[in-house]
């Protein structure tokens, strides 16, 4: 029975990582409110190397729909502005010479529905990842049984345990998705 504990534990850890990945991915979908995580994926050309924006500037939220990007090095202001314009955010940066303001526009009803669909698609990708982890876990358990490390009864018990772990992870993903959809649709 001991040989299978790492299999279940590893699968649980992978499922938790899949949930965390989903949270990060959904965090990039903006819901009409300013959130510093919107800028996490932006890299700025800095002394010839692409550098994450959050490593070269302070990002704050002075108002509900405004992000303020204050670079640590004022000479990088233009590069930051260009990187934001080149991104897929669809937000025009306003450079005041010392910082960049990003005003998040109000979302239209149509755009909210589009974002809700995007949330569902990202969520489904997370569920597929969890199911793939479950499949790999089941394969490993069956292999252990085939090698004589498990009895039929042990295998059945562990398969039930694996299913519970999977169901819990899917339930967490559904909750994360529901919360994000509500955030997007209500704005």
UniProtKB/Swiss-Prot annotation:
One of its GO terms (molecular function) is ribosomal large subunit binding. Keywords: Cytoplasm, Protein biosynthesis. GO terms for cellular component: cytoplasm. GO terms for biological process: translational termination. SUPFAM superfamilies: Ribosome recycling factor, RRF. Transmembrane segments: none annotated. The keyword Cytoplasm applies. Pfam families: RRF (PF01765). It is found in: Cytoplasm. It comes from the Bacteria. Belongs to the RRF family. HAMAP family: RRF (MF_00040). Responsible for the release of ribosomes from messenger RNA at the termination of protein biosynthesis. May increase the efficiency of translation by recycling ribosomes from one round of translation to another. This is Ribosome-recycling factor.
